[in-house]
A protein has these predicted regions:
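Domain-level signature for soluble enzymes in the chorismate/prephenate branch of the shikimate pathway
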Residues: 1-85
Length: 85
């Protein structure tokens, strides 16, 4: 790889690292909200709400298409987040 390409690659990687830092902060906020929801649901024995999950995934698919992102990718990401808890 040429030095110029290596420099460009490193610059892109630094941008990705910064973006990853931002994503971690957002995931932390989402995790805190999910924990609050779970605390309320545990009292009602309603941990998994399939209707809500379907609605979330439907909305994510629409938003992905609008932003020209492959909905298969975002579907996998959101499913993993949802079922991680």
């Amino acid at each position: 790889m040429s030095p110029l390409k290596k420099e460009k690659l490193n610059k892109i990687r630094k941008e990705l690292d910064k973006l990853d830092d931002s994503l971690i902060k957002i995931i932390k906020k989402r995790t805190n909200l999910v924990k609050r929801v779970l605390a309320l649901k545990e009292k009602k024995n309603q941990i998994v709400d399939q209707k809500r999950i379907k609605l979330i995934l439907k909305n994510i698919k629409k938003k992905s298409i609008n932003h020209k992102i492959d909905p298969k990718i975002t579907n996998k990401i959101w499913r993993n987040m949802i079922y991680a808890y």
